[in-house]
Design a protein with these regions (language model features):
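Structured alpha/beta reader/binder surfaces that contact nucleic acids or chromatin modification marks
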Residues: 2-106
């Protein structure tokens, strides 16, 4: 039997703005406080480890470390947020963080 090429570590989208951006437009830039161990194809989910809902299969790519919210400006249009200040305020545990490009995978 052929093994799935989906990575083990799911990526969670519990904040509506980036989740809706991803599902409506097929792409979202997301900033996470902790650097992910895995990138590549994985499952996007909503919820937590005990109870979650599968949203889609996605491809996660690391962009780089972000120190200040102003550095998010080039990615704002595809973040789901209106301002970098709003986006920065939603990053769990705040900045610095790690920026990822997440696309729906075919």
């Amino acid at each position: 039997m052929k093994r799935s090429k989906v990575a083990n570590a799911s990526i969670y989208f519990n904040i509506p703005e980036p989740r809706n951006q991803l599902l409506k437009n097929g792409i979202v830039y997301t900033c996470r406080h902790k650097k992910r161990i895995n990138t590549g194809v994985t499952v996007a989910r909503r919820g937590d480890f005990k109870k979650s809902v599968k949203l889609a299969i996605v491809d996660v790519r690391y962009i780089g470390r972000v120190e200040k919210s102003q550095e998010l400006k080039p990615y704002l249009k595809e973040s789901g947020f209106e301002t970098t200040k709003e986006w920065g305020s939603k990053i769990k545990d705040g900045l610095p963080g790690h920026l990822y490009k997440v696309r729906l995978s075919l």
